[in-house]
């Protein structure tokens, strides 16, 4: 895993209108899923090696310091520019430790991922949910036409 320097981890959102969150956190840069529809691949983000995942150096210390300076709790989006549960997360635990900080500072969280690794941190989502909003959004990619049907009840699928 390569690391890149970071000045900030907790970034204020320009508008809450699109996603309902007032801050974003991206502990990683790049994504290995290769989704053609991903707008994070856009040239405007100046990441020519988007398919290569790198971690941000000292991300947890920076996040802790930035959360400590907050006057009021934030509602934080994770996964806007990189999947927080990429394959490297299983070993690095950056997302898990960031969730511990988000919980400790009474913030809410909205997470976007394609990974079932999210269930590893269900205890933290439950703890955060006791004091703040939690939204977990999972993208399911399939070639099974039956799963694509509008209105499918995923609780009833095998």
Question: Which residues are covered by each model-predicted region?
Answer:
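N-terminal [4Fe-4S]-dependent radical SAM core
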Residues: 1-28, 39-55, 59-75
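Cys/His-enriched microdomains
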Residues: 29, 33
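Basic, often amphipathic N-terminal segments
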Residues: 36
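Conserved AdoMet/S-adenosylmethionine-binding subsite of the radical SAM
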Residues: 58-76, 80-158
């Amino acid at each position: 895993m390569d690391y890149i320097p970071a000045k900030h981890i907790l970034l204020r959102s320009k508008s809450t209108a699109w996603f309902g969150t007032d801050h974003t956190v991206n502990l990683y840069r790049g994504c290995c899923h290769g989704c053609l529809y991903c707008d994070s691949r856009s040239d405007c983000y100046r990441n020519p090696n988007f398919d290569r995942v790198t971690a941000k150096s000292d991300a947890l210390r920076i996040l802790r310091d930035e959360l400590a300076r907050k006057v009021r709790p934030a509602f934080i989006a994770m996964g806007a520019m990189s999947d927080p549960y990429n394959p490297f997360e299983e070993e690095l635990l950056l997302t898990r430790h960031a969730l511990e900080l988000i919980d400790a500072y009474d913030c809410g969280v909205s997470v976007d991922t394609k990974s079932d690794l999210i269930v590893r941190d269900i205890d933290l989502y439950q703890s955060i949910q006791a004091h703040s909003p939690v939204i977990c959004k999972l993208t399911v990619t399939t070639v099974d036409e039956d799963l694509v049907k509008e209105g499918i009840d995923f609780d009833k699928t095998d």
